[in-house]
Amino acid sequence: MGGMSWIHWVIVIAVVALLFGGRGKLSGIMGDAAKGIKAFKDGLKDDSSDEVSANKATGALPRTEAEKEDLRKS
């Protein structure tokens, strides 16, 4: 509990290497992470817009008999 085992030192060295090594700046790493998140969100947005356009195309026709009866009553 008082001392650090070898696995703790490996983790500490990995974190230090990530922060100060690698690309040289933490901001560069965070910038890359932000670009990845933005690309992921854009991909989700593109998928949802495709679904919306598909729903609009099929949404013009009633899908069930109950919807057809509702339209007839109106």
UniProtKB/Swiss-Prot annotation:
Residues 43-74 are annotated as: Disordered. Pfam families: TatA_B_E. It is found in: Cell inner membrane. One of its GO terms (biological process) is protein transport by the Tat complex. The keyword Transcription does not apply. InterPro entries: TatA/B/E (IPR003369), TatA/E (IPR006312). Residues 64-74 have a biased composition (Basic and acidic residues). GO terms for molecular function: protein transmembrane transporter activity. One of its GO terms (cellular component) is TAT protein transport complex. Keywords: Cell inner membrane, Cell membrane, Membrane, Protein transport, Translocation, Transmembrane, Transmembrane helix, Transport. The keyword Lyase does not apply. Gene3D superfamilies: 1.20.5.3310. Disulfide bonds: none annotated. It is a single-pass membrane protein. The chain crosses the membrane at residues 1-21. Part of the twin-arginine translocation (Tat) system that transports large folded proteins containing a characteristic twin-arginine motif in their signal peptide across membranes. TatA could form the protein-conducting channel of the Tat system. Belongs to the TatA/E family. The Tat system comprises two distinct complexes: a TatABC complex, containing multiple copies of TatA, TatB and TatC subunits, and a separate TatA complex, containing only TatA subunits. Substrates initially bind to the TatABC complex, which probably triggers association of the separate TatA complex to form the active translocon. This is Sec-independent protein translocase protein TatA. It comes from Caulobacter sp. (strain K31).
